[in-house]
């Protein structure tokens, strides 16, 4: 959530910055809400002053032994007016909060202002695209003999699911373990095991709710008892779309000692996405799934450190690609292509030979204080006033897409897969993964 004071001070400037994100700020609505809020607060202050005056007058009259029925009746009316105003103010504050919840983050000044992904800026390219002297297979054809099974997954769950067996399941597990170990030992992240289901407050904290509810898998749970309509009380849980949600929420409603910053976490979890709006896209293979594994990096920093932390975090994800000997490029997203909560984002795109294209394998973002304001995640220096932390996150990496890239870039003429040296210790020293 952006700072409401920015809107109150210069709403035109905020609207202009948001327009670069293809977001039209409803200036008229916000001004109307603010005008009523100010009027109500002024009226409440006036009523409070009047009640204080009446209370003094009542005290003086009673001290003189005089009656104060009229003043007491007036106090009763003032109290009723204050209660009515307080109720309306609470409703109004909720409306303002809902309004703010729907506004995306402001882009950092270093982000190029452009309309869509076609104008993202490539800032780095690493590795040589492999040249094959045989017909290149895609990961579906390569994976089948290694234990990749879409048919049985469709029988069990439906489309956009996979079953991995034998060699390919082992390779998938090895990739995740290699990523976690590298981040924990080389990059000093603390490993976290977190819930795969979270409550609505956690989803609101990181920005998935209320805007992106249709992209989530919701799990209602009966709580016992009935609501006001006689229906059974329920509470919604949500399957996590990324470990960013539970891990970032570790600091929700917390005041962190500045000596503990930065906080660096790594977590390996399954991720669950409905892929609403993705009908017809990447229908073949593992690129777009309802369930997939990801190793996620999260950092909690002081405001002045967050931009350098983004460079560092992105570099940590790049390190995995380089150790896996996978060609990739680093792209700075323009304002029109950034995620809802991001103030600056780098995408890492890995080379996929069968598609003759680079495909996203990691997205690394600084959220500034956007999530922290929603979560009330703060830090304090000594006895000073608490300030909002900055939060960052990035994939380090998406395990399934790393598997896709490894299969295709390291394929051999006989369908076997050459294992990068850094990954071999996680496969018992295996240098080549052969079909079953």
From Swiss-Prot:
InterPro entries: aa-tRNA-synt_IIb, aa-tRNA-synth_II, aa-tRNA-synth_II/BPL/LPL, Ser-tRNA-ligase_type_1, Ser-tRNA-synth_1_N, SerRS_1_N_sf, SerRS_core, tRNA-bd_arm. The gene is serS. Consists of two distinct domains, a catalytic core and a N-terminal extension that is involved in tRNA binding. ATP binds at residues 273-275, 360-363. It catalyses: tRNA(Ser) + L-serine + ATP = L-seryl-tRNA(Ser) + AMP + diphosphate + H(+); tRNA(Sec) + L-serine + ATP = L-seryl-tRNA(Sec) + AMP + diphosphate + H(+). The keyword Transmembrane helix does not apply. Gene3D superfamilies: Bira Bifunctional Protein, Domain 2, Serine-tRNA synthetase, tRNA binding domain. Catalyzes the attachment of serine to tRNA(Ser). Is also able to aminoacylate tRNA(Sec) with serine, to form the misacylated tRNA L-seryl-tRNA(Sec), which will be further converted into selenocysteinyl-tRNA(Sec). This is Serine--tRNA ligase. It is an enzyme of class 6 (ligase). Its main location: cytoplasm.
